[in-house]
Structures are given as structure tokens and as C-alpha cells.
Design a protein with these regions (language model features):
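Conserved PLP-binding catalytic core of the aspartate aminotransferase-like
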Residues: 270, 282-314, 330
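PLP-dependent enzyme catalytic core of the Aspartate aminotransferase-like
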Residues: 164, 310-314, 319, 323-353
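Active-site phosphate-binding strand-loop segment of PLP-dependent enzymes
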Residues: 130-186
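N-terminal "arm"/small-domain region of PLP-dependent enzymes with the aminotransferase-like
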Residues: 1-56, 71, 143-144
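PLP-dependent aminotransferase class I/II
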Residues: 201-281, 285-288
């Protein structure tokens, strides 16, 4: 670091994203991207005509996308705010609803950016351990005088709470915002969007990166009461009014409108997940009951870090977290059936060594 860096940032540990290799071809099962191409409707929407408009700023109000999203989710446009990826939505939420005297409560094993953002903004963290089986006990979040964020389904475990459990947390914290990070909800979770009109302290965040094949476009949605969304827009318009580029606005709108393609690819991933889970269990691996587009798995026969490195050496990328309680587990993104067969064949060779 340079001598000019603010002392407040010297102790911040930045987030470590999953590998994005540029120099070698891998079976890439490490960052929970979709293995399928974007919808043909998206390709058509991002036309040459739209490319020519890149000389102009995008619509800061995201008008057309909001109209489409409002119809899709059964909300009003003023209950939704698009973000440059759901990460931006979440960051804005922490900026709006937390500060140095108002902590953020979250699980010890969950999305790593929560702790990074707390460090960056000097927000106290209240870290709540998951149970021994990696499930989250909603009662641990009752009656906290803190902002709460729950990834549901959780990452990297893939486990999900029913909507009723989240509702219990909302009821027990009427004076604090409860953020539900639903990045993976389309693969088997139960969305809390239907609760928005009943709880003005609920903020739901979803992404287009996983189930709508737009990870590279960077688009997320925050959904909640009109007053919560107004708070987020206060942050947005104080930082970057043009946060969504023109092509992403068109791509996101088209992705929401193509329900047939969404369901086809979503179902394919869920089916492949079930088959892969069965195959891993037949090989003696422990596999959590994922409701996401990945599996969290371990074996007593080999160390998780060792498996990760050997798979990478043989051309298969998965995710390993060198962290307490999960150092022997791997997170494996669900790819196409062909990709998962290659993964399993490679795994078999390693296990025979």
C-alpha cells in the first residue's frame, strides 16, 4: 500500500473473488455462473441500434426496466431499485441502514462481502454462528437492535430457510431493517417478495447473475417498501446516478420477459444438481441439501484443499474456502450434464491416487 492510503483503510481485508482464468481453458465450476447462454431475447435486445446509443448516458431512473420488474414481481416501480449487481444493492443498504453505532448481524459462514463492507465502512459486526449442521437458527436473530442480513439460500452451504422462518425474524425486529439476500432463490428457495407489502422493514435483494445468465452484465434488484427504496436511492444519487449501463438495462428487461427460457434453464440446473448430488453420495461424499445452483460437499478420504488443487491441476475449477469449520468442504457450481460428468470422472481419478 502507498503512504497516501487513509489510515482507516489500512486494516481492511478486501474480498477475494473466485478465479477467472484468462490463460487456460477449465471446466469452470467455481463462481456459480450459469452454464447456459443468455436468453435469445437478451441477444436481440442488445442490438446494434443500442450499441450506437452508448454515446449517451443511460436512464438514471431505469424507467423501462422498473416497469417490467414491477409487473414480474407484483410490486410498484417505486418499490424496486436496480443496482450494478446485487453487490451494489447490498452495499447501498449497509450504507443506508448501518453506521459506526448501528451494527450488522450476519452468520459466521455466509457471503464474504458482508464482513468486507463492514470493515470498509467501520460498521460493527455481530457474527452469529450457524449450528453444527450449518443450518441457521432464526431465533438467534430475534430481538436484535441491529440491521440483519440473511442470505437465503445461504452461500456457500446452499441451505435455505422457509419464508415463515424469515417472517419470524421480521416480526421480532420491527424497528430494524432485515435484508434477505436471495441471489440463489430461483433454484429452490422460497422468496420473501410476497412479504414486502406486509413488512416495511423488509428488503429483498436478487441478482440476474445466476438464473438469468447475466453475471457479466452486472444487474441486481433491491425490493422493499417505497420508503426503504427511497433511502437506497438517496445513496445512489449521492454516488453514481448512472449506475446501470444502457446495454444492461435492455438485457435485464429482456431476461425478465423471457419466462420460457428462464424456466427451461432453471429446471435443467435443478435436475443436474439432483443427479450430481446422487453421484457424489454414491461415492461416499457428504453433500448438503442445496437449494442453490451449487453443491457443498466433503469427504473424509481427502482434504478439501488437496482436492481443490488436484482438480485445478487436471483442468476443473471448484471453490475452496480456507476458513474455520469449512476448510474440508468444496463448493461446486452446477454446470451442464456434460461438464458435471467430466468433473466426476476427474474426481474419480483423483480419489484412486
Amino acid at each position: 500500500m502507498s503512504k497516501y492510503l487513509s489510515p482507516k483503510l489500512e486494516t481492511v481485508t478486501p474480498y477475494t473473488p473466485g478465479e477467472q482464468p484468462q490463460d487456460q481453458q477449465y471446466i469452470k465450476l467455481n463462481t456459480n455462473e450459469s452454464p447456459y447462454l443468455p436468453s435469445p431475447a437478451v441477444v436481440a435486445a442488445v442490438s446494434e441500434h443500442e450499441v450506437e446509443k452508448l454515446r449517451l448516458y443511460s436512464d438514471p431512473a431505469c424507467t423501462d426496466l422498473l416497469k417490467t420488474a414491477a409487473v414480474h414481481f407484483g410490486l410498484q416501480p417505486d418499490q424496486i431499485m436496480p443496482g450494478n449487481g446485487s453487490d451494489e444493492n447490498l452495499f447501498f443498504a449497509l450504507r443506508a441502514f448501518c453506521d459506526e453505532t448501528h451494527p450488522l448481524a450476519y452468520a459466521d459462514i455466509t457471503y464474504g462481502c458482508y464482513s468486507v463492507w463492514c470493515g470498509l465502512m467501520h460498521i460493527p459486526s455481530h457474527i452469529i454462528p450457524l449450528k453444527e449442521d450449518f443450518t441457521l437458527d432464526p431465533a438467534d436473530y430475534y430481538g436484535l437492535n441491529e440491521t440483519i442480513v440473511i442470505a437465503n439460500p445461504n452461500a456457500p452451504t446452499g441451505l435455505a430457510l422457509p419464508r415463515s422462518a424469515i417472517e419470524g425474524v421480521l416480526k421480532a425486529n420491527p424497528d430494524n431493517v432485515v435484508i434477505v439476500d436471495e441471489a440463489y432463490v430461483d433454484f429452490g428457495g422460497e422468496s420473501c417478495v410476497p412479504l414486502i407489502d406486509r413488512y416495511d422493514n423488509l428488503l429483498v435483494v436478487q441478482t440476474f447473475s445466476k438464473s438469468r445468465q447475466l453475471a457479466g452484465a452486472r444487474l441486481g434488484l433491491a425490493m422493499g417498501s417505497a420508503s426503504l427504496i427511497a433511502d437506497l436511492n438517496r445513496v445512489k444519487f449521492s454516488l453514481n446516478p448512472y449506475n446501470i449501463n444502457r446495454l444492461t438495462l435492455k438485457a435485464g428487461q429482456a431476461a425478465l420477459e423471457d419466462a420460457v427460457y428462464f424456466e427451461k434453464t432453471r429446471a435443467a440446473i435443478v435436475d443436474t444438481r439432483a443427479w450430481t448430488k446422487q453421484q457424489l453420495e454414491a461415492r461416499g461424499f457428504a453433500v448438503l441439501d442445496s437449494r442453490s445452483n451449487f453443491l457443498f460437499t466433503s469427504t473424509q478420504k481427502k482434504n478439501g484443499g488437496e482436492l481443490y488443487h488436484k482438480l485445478k491441476k487436471k483442468g476443473v475449477l471448484v471453490r475452496h474456502f480456507d476458513a474455520p469449520r469449512i476448510e474440508n468442504w468444496l463448493r461446486i457450481t452446477i454446470g451442464t450434464p456434460e461438464q458435471m460428468q467430466i468433473f466426476l470422472n476427474t474426481l474419480d481419478k483423483i480419489m484412486e491416487e
